[in-house]
Amino acid sequence: MATKKMRISEKLWDSLEKDECNIDEVVQLMSLDEEELITKFAQEVSLRIRYLDEKPNEISFIAEATEDYSEPETESSDEETYFQQIRMERGESSETKREQQDLGATRKRKIEERNPFYTPPVHKGIPSSTGRGTEISTLNLDCISSFEERKVMIDKWFNEISLIIQTNKESFDTSLKVLTLMEHRTEGIAKSFIKQATWDILITPEKIIEEVLTGFYTMFIGLDYALSAEKEEEKRIKKAEELLIKSQLCNICELDNFTCFYEKQINQLKFEDFPKWIELYLGKIPIIGKQSKERWDNEKSFTTKYSLAFAKRIIQEEIAKYCDFQRTSKKLKNFSKKCCSKNSLDPLVSFGCRDTKKKDFKKSSKYKAYKKKKTLKKLWKKKKRKFTPGKYFSKKKPEKFCPQGRKKCRCWICTEEGHYANECPNRKSHQEKVKILIHGMNEGYYPLEDAYTGNLEVFSMEIIEETTSEEESTTDSDSSSSDDEQLSF
């Protein structure tokens, strides 16, 4: 045995050095035990072709030693057993099949001797087109908030499990083996639910599948599988009917997409209701729907009236007829009528009759039709612009009494610089000037700070009052002083 494994491992190492193999597969093979490795190479022809350089049209078989394990094994006997390979053609394989059956029975007996009370289930996976089994997916419902997504995952997973059990009934003949398979193919909360729940082990594998499915629906979707099945079916049928009624086909080029949608929804309904929904399908087809409906009524049979594909085939044939008619009508436009009289097979029945002719009048190039020019509509309103002065224009500031704007002006009372007349500290000593200033301001005059450059005119004002003889004596004395009073402005 050890020598056999050593020989096979040498072949595997050679294939690794040549980079002609899958590294993961080689590592997995080398991690097997001696008996499992030799058995795997004996059962799978592809491994022997790939690593042991066998031809595809031959079958090789590695014969195990029939000696008892208590007897000592020598290296020479192992080498002779390894090199004694029975090579036979495919047509002469009766002896090889018998030896393979004996080998399988021996291997099964050894496994039962290791654990005589319970044998773990060994599933072969889902059958595929290539002949090899594909591993089923592991169910993990952790952190999936959508109940619809959970329902789809659970249904798909249970379909795969039921397919494995039905195709391998000998391996999964008890409910305990089915539960073990489900436990190994779940993760997270689904696996803990299978472990913690109490199951009836004495029931059949088919019933244990239904119980686990009911438990999954209750715990992870919140539905009673037995009671909600009818409600879910009614809801599904109602929704499909609404979608079929609302659907419409506007462009006949989208016939395939429309038919795909219609076929998906019609299969959600009951089978006996198919004919009336197919009639509705034909009525939704534009242009040729009426002709297709008439053909369907005349050509349908007891079986084809339930087929949506039969209705679509009629529609496609009508579309082909319509397209051919369009092509011929385009060709007839270019056909000359002069050839009809020459090539006519019927005798001439009209004599001296004028044929209706259509004259084409050419329009003179002098007169051309007047075409109004297109004008774009203004989407804005024209605003009246106001005059906005630029940076070189500014308003004239009003002049002040003191244009310089500072306290260097000369006082009008004391003729000193540094203060204004209203702040003059010498007002008491110049009361006469103050009176004249107040009187002039009341009359609307203002004193000038700068010297007057124009012609200066001086006016005098005399006040004459009618007095009595008694008062003339007093006024004569004061007349000298009053005559000298002059006001200059």
UniProtKB/Swiss-Prot annotation:
InterPro entries: Caulimo_coat (IPR001988), Znf_CCHC (IPR001878), Znf_CCHC_sf (IPR036875). A motif (Nuclear localization signal) lies at residues 107-110. GO terms for cellular component: host cell; host cell nucleus; T=7 icosahedral viral capsid. Signal peptide: none annotated. It comes from the Viruses. It is found in: Virion; Host nucleus. A zinc finger (CCHC-type) spans 409-426. One of its GO terms (molecular function) is structural molecule activity. One of its GO terms (biological process) is symbiont entry into host cell. Transmembrane segments: none annotated. Keywords: Capsid protein, Host nucleus, Metal-binding, T=7 icosahedral capsid protein, Viral penetration into host nucleus, Virion, Virus entry into host cell, Zinc, Zinc-finger. Its main location: virion. Residues 87-101 have a biased composition (Basic and acidic residues). SUPFAM superfamilies: Retrovirus zinc finger-like domains. Residues 87-111, 466-489 are annotated as: Disordered. Self assembles to form an icosahedral capsid, about 50 nm in diameter, nm, composed of 420 subunits of the viral capsid protein. The capsid encapsulates the genomic dsDNA. Following virus entry into host cell, provides nuclear import of the viral genome. Virus particles do not enter the nucleus, but dock at the nuclear membrane through the interaction with host importins. Interacts (via nuclear localization signal) with host importin alpha. Belongs to the caulimoviridae capsid protein family. This is Probable capsid protein. It comes from Figwort mosaic virus (strain DxS).
